[in-house]
Amino acid sequence: MDKHAKRSSLLHYPVLIVFTLFFVGLFALDLITPDRAYSEMENTTLSQRPALTQLSAKGLNSYFTAYTKYVKDQVFGRDQWISLQSMVETTLLQKEQNGGILLGKEHMMFPRTFGLLSSEERTLPKNTSAVESLCQRYPGKVNVLLAPAASDIYPENVPANAPLLDENTYLDQLSAAVQAAGGRFVDVRGTLTDHKGEYLYYRTDHHWTSLGAYYAYQQLCDALGLTPFDTAAHTALTADRFYGTHYSKARTWNAVPDTITWYDLPNQLTIYNVTAAGQPTDGETTGLYDTDKLTVYDKYAMFLHGNNGLSRVQGDGTGRILVIKDSYANCFVPYLTANYADIDVVDFRNYNFGLDQLIADTDYDQILVLYSFDSFTSDPYLYRAGVTG
């Protein structure tokens, strides 16, 4: 067969030619495209090319497993391929969940939480006991505010027949335990439900919005006899196109991005290194917001510069408050500047000590434990609130 005949026979397989050219082109693009260390869309670290030294150190199978993962993570157009897959699955297959995230009405996303994990069943009693101990050691000073999940406030937007965890029984038990131990439980479920027609939770993220946090803050002020932060007297700033943690898992093609709102405040934040219990050192002073984070994927990290072990906010009020928190408090704390002169913020993920020495040195007027219910059931570090001495 001459060359002309071979060429003519190949033309009978146009699909084969197209696919061959496609994969050759994709391979070439992979070769010339720089590897990425991090995927902002997925909020995850990407695999890097395994060193040839691993071949002899770990064996052929282990090396090729690592190399296959590297190729998968670094494929050209990875974000676009993931979005295409999501579009096909949600549009053609009518999927109601993706990546462990339930796709609800009004473009809301919910974590697929059908019950407490076995680890959470062990952690929840420990954290409850720790907070009870804190209430008993500082009677009349401890306030506990647990933010309910968005699914608890917007059950009508959860996909039909999804048997999500009912938090109410647990929250009722926690309320009773806190009050019996001499603390105050600030139950915000009713307040948030009353305002559910407003933008209280992000659609694509697991946090509440600054507005949701504000309504919870107002209820705390009512309980403590404080005048709330006046939002009308301050300039509200916004950042659009926020895709949060739920989106990073679900990666739906038609997700509606969120908007972050914060208030332009001149108050200062000092972030400390802590080398011993209650002994902060090497403070770095900055503003309340890390606006550089608005240019990256995790925009919510702008509030309080993320989850620092110990930081102090300079307020405009009087007295001192200690906030023991998860990231739900990050957009809540700025409102407290209207009420207190000093707002100390502890995040046990990065604070490896108990609280008694810090409290003894600072003499707080109030203590606020602010977590989401989800974090309260799973945080392996909150037990430190119950450590005495």
Which role fits each region the language model picked out?
Residues M1-G389:
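Extracellular glycan-modifying ectodomains
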